[in-house]
Amino acid sequence: MALKITQVKGLVGTKPNHRANMESLGLKRIGHSVVKQDTPIIRGMVHKVRHLVTVEEVAGE
């Protein structure tokens, strides 16, 4: 199982650790999406920035 993570809000005014988290996920701009493996580490990173992203489960990978 994989997760499709899409950035839906900008990073202006966010905490530095949230910006670092988004960079680690590979998200750079609003509307940008990445597909990551569903692991506890990725789930934790998404949980920290859940107000900035949307998450969908996708089959494959």
Swiss-Prot record:
SUPFAM superfamilies: Ribosomal protein L30p/L7e (SSF55129). GO terms for biological process: translation. GO terms for molecular function: structural constituent of ribosome. CDD domains: Ribosomal_L30 (cd01658). It holds the Pfam family Ribosomal_L30. Keywords: Ribonucleoprotein, Ribosomal protein. GO terms for cellular component: cytosolic large ribosomal subunit. It comes from the Bacteria. InterPro entries: Ribo_uL30_ferredoxin-like_sf, Ribosomal_uL30_bac-type, Ribosomal_uL30_ferredoxin-like. Part of the 50S ribosomal subunit. Belongs to the universal ribosomal protein uL30 family. This is Large ribosomal subunit protein uL30. It comes from Corynebacterium aurimucosum (strain ATCC 700975 / DSM 44827 / CIP 107346 / CN-1). The gene is rpmD.
